[in-house]
Amino acid sequence: MTPEYKAIKNILDANKHIADVSQARQLLAQLLPYSAHWDDCRDIIAGNIYGQLIWSIATGYEVLGDYENAVQIANDGILKIEEDSDYNPKVKSAIYEILGRCYSQLGDKEKAVSAIEKMPYYDPFQLNTHWPNESFYSFRSVSEYSLQDLRNNTVSLSSVSTFNDPVDSSFFPWIDKQLREKSTDDARKIYLEAMKEAFGKYRARCFVATRPLPLNWEEAKAPRESFENVPPYFNTLMWAHYSNYHKGFCVEYNIPSDVAGVDVRTKRVVAMRPINYVDNMPYKQELSFEEAFLTKSKRWEYEHEVRMIYFKQGDNSANPVVSLGNDYEKSIRAVYIGMRCHKEHEAEILDIMRAHPSIPVYRMKVSNDDIYSLERELIAGNIRETVSSIAPKKKQCWFCRCLKKVVKAIGCK
């Protein structure tokens, strides 16, 4: 580690946030004399602070309004950072964001979009989570896409903007409001339009868990409140909201661990992440990725949603498909057919599942004990119980229990 490296690191440590023009001038005055030694900071063994260095210098120029120098520094730096590693997602996303803002200030919308389109690839990098024994449920209407997914062991995705709740993703109402308010600021408008175009390319699929899953390591370690472990397919609201009023079906998945992850060769990222539920979402100047795409109103908290987020650079497909692998029986644990599913649709589902006789297929019906509850009956395949697929025990009142005992004692049927 050279003396110059140490000096640069000390300067960066003292200037992690550039608040104003005065600080920007001071930072550049300190760092520019070391320009011959900037590449020394690319040394991974020494600590690899090169990304922080490039971000700081480019931000300094941006704060001063010197957008051309900011672009030059950021472009030269990001080429080296990409060359050094396929990772460092936070640094790369931050530098591409600077490029997007500065190109917008220079009036170059095409280059602004090109830079900002790199951000959606890096933002979900560190969000991947996996629960090897957890069941995830997908409620579907019967359609070409849903039957194709069931047949091919795939998951088709769609834009979050097409979900049933118009504020399901905070990003779209947030950016539309920003565009309305910044309509007279040409540079800001270019930047926001580029953001909307780039981040509008995210695709997603919603799954439902049997319990609220931890959002981070701290939550995973903390003691959690007890809850009734009732599988989602017993929830009449889920069928009504997401399965065409009980006319569709529900698939119980065990998502393989290698599905979620990053493919650096094709620049594709698939992330699995629980939704965070909040009381409100005030408008503010900036949104984090989690706030924009992985946060919903507490009114939806009963769903225990886990969202699959997909992005691939250069892929503009409306409904891309993610494969769950070749082991069908490992990926799909069970299929549940809605109580109002048309007979011809049920026949199509059963025809697909004949190729996988070990997987149970159930038909849902109104419970014999409670009109407001659902039951399942096995109509194909073999029963393969998991912790999450055991039907909840029906609680009966004291009088009913006594009456049953009396009926049994006198031999009535």
What are these regions (language model features)?
Residues 12-19, 62, 104:
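Specific register positions within alpha-helical solenoid repeats of the TPR/Sel1-like families, i.e.
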Residues 10, 49, 56, 91-94, ...:
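"A position-specific structural signal for the A-helix of alpha-solenoid helical repeats
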